[in-house]
């Protein structure tokens, strides 16, 4: 597949955007759209490390009406912390507000085990729980009537209407072997981070091989942390500081 014409570029939501007036928020987002950026990107955490976080779907809902030229990318949504019926309804509602503009990235998190514990979720089950929820959400967003998996979710005859038109791409994030398998089995693509171009290309091959029987319209992405400085060392220092502050890990761990 020739992907040379499929490239899109997004930018993370400005950290101070919520503190600005609606007029200033619109001005900044308009400047992003004027620059040719395709989408705005936001993360998702319930209570990360010191209690900080943001509900990614709520933030994108707020942004959706401020600049209609920009698509909306959630990366990544901690699905294991939500019930799949509720998550599917929220995704469907946002897709109705911004048809054709929403992409939802799904991840398992885990950098902060306490975030899962305070939500009543065993961190050790987050991968299997995400797999179960992702399979259910995909069927729900296709308009199917589903039953819970019997291990994590116990319900019958769940359904979400109306279904999003067009369908919402569900992209799976992560670097592990399990993440690549999850992307191939359940996703419409893979969202990579902290990997080389070679590793990115290899990961895409693995994902598409696993998902060959489904043959979706693959949409892969690579998340980059970029530091703008006076030179390479200054730019690297800015990135390393921000990543260490956010993840509470030494930069070299990445």
Name each region found by the language model.
Residues 1-254:
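Active-site-adjacent structural elements that line small-molecule/cofactor binding pockets in enzymes
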């Amino acid at each position: 597949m020739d992907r040379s014409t499929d490239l899109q570029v997004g930018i993370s939501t400005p950290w101070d955007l919520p503190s600005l007036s609606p007029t200033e928020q619109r001005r900044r987002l308009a400047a992003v759209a004027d620059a040719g950026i395709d989408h705005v990107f936001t993360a998702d955490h319930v209570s990360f490390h010191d209690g900080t976080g943001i509900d990614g779907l709520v933030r994108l809902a707020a942004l959706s009406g401020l600049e209609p030229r920009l698509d909306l990318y959630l990366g990544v949504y901690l699905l294991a912390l939500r019930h799949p019926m509720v998550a599917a309804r929220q995704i469907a509602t946002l897709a109705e507000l911004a048809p054709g503009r929403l992409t939802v990235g799904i991840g398992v998190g885990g950098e902060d085990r306490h975030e899962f514990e305070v939500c009543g979720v065993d961190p050790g089950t987050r991968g299997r729980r995400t797999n179960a929820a992702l399979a259910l959400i995909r069927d729900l967003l296709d308009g199917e009537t589903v039953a819970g998996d019997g291990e994590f979710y116990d319900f019958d005859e769940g359904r979400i209407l109306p279904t999003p038109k067009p369908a919402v791409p569900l992209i799976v994030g992560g670097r592990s072997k399990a993440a690549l398998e999850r992307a191939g089995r359940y996703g419409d693509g893979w969202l990579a981070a902290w990997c080389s171009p070679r590793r990115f290309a290899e990961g895409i091959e693995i994902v598409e091989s696993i998902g060959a029987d489904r043959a979706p319209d693959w949409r892969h992405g690579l998340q980059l942390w970029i530091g703008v400085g006076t030179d390479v060392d200054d730019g690297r220092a800015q990135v390393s500081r921000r990543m260490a502050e956010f993840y509470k890990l030494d930069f070299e761990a990445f």
